[in-house]
Amino acid sequence: MKVLIISAVLFITIFSNISAEIEDDFLEDESFEAEDIIPFFENEQARSCIPKHEECTNDKHNCCRKGLFKLKCQCSTFDDESGQPTERCACGRPMGHQAIETGLNIFRGLFKGKKKNKKTKG
């Protein structure tokens, strides 16, 4: 029995030393420095969505979601001070999406009104 306990303790000691060395080697190989992390955060900030009525001229596919649908980048052409046509875009809700959401809100309001009436009757 003593031999079994001594060999178990010896095995655990050797195993813990080996795993500690492997972990140290892994951390040295995969170490992250500030220069490695900064570009990651810059990319994350660039991917944040563009809210409603904000300009999306340079990033037309990155408008936020509002309600049921994602906002669309809607563009218009204007003449600048020099008379050259320039395109300006802003995130907005298309009329079709706006009509659908308004209709659904009215429809939901009808059912909420019926539930309130049932509660007041009983």
From Swiss-Prot:
**The entry's keywords:** Amidation, Calcium channel impairing toxin, Cytolysis, Disulfide bond, Ion channel impairing toxin, Knottin, Membrane, Neurotoxin, Secreted, Signal, Target cell membrane, Target membrane, Toxin, Voltage-gated calcium channel impairing toxin
Q: Where is the signal peptide?
A: 1-20
Q: Does the keyword Signal apply?
A: yes
Q: Which residues are part of the propeptide segment?
A: 21-47
Residues bearing PTM Lysine amide: K121
For molecular function, the Gene Ontology terms on record are: calcium channel regulator activity; toxin activity
Where does this chain mainly localize? secreted
* Cellular component terms (Gene Ontology): extracellular region; membrane; other organism cell membrane
| Domain of life according to the entry | Eukaryota
Which residue pairs form cystines in this protein? C49-C64, C56-C73, C63-C91, C75-C89
Extract the Pfam families matched here: Toxin_35 (PF10530)
Region (Predicted alpha-helix) residue spans:
99-112
Arginine amide PTM sites in chain numbering: R108
**Where located?**
Secreted; Target cell membrane
Give the UniProt record's GO annotations in the biological process aspect: killing of cells of another organism
Tissue specificity: Expressed by the venom gland.
Q: Does the keyword Mitochondrion apply?
A: no
What family is this protein classified in? Answer: Belongs to the neurotoxin 19 (CSTX) family. 04 (U1-Lctx) subfamily.
Domain notes for this protein:
The presence of a 'disulfide through disulfide knot' structurally defines this protein as a knottin.
| Subunit structure comment from the entry | Monomer. Interacts with CSTX-13 (AC P83919) (Kd=430 nM), but does not interact with CSTX-9 (AC P58604).
- Protein name, UniProt field: Toxin CSTX-1
Native organism taxonomy: Eukaryota, Metazoa, Ecdysozoa, Arthropoda, Chelicerata
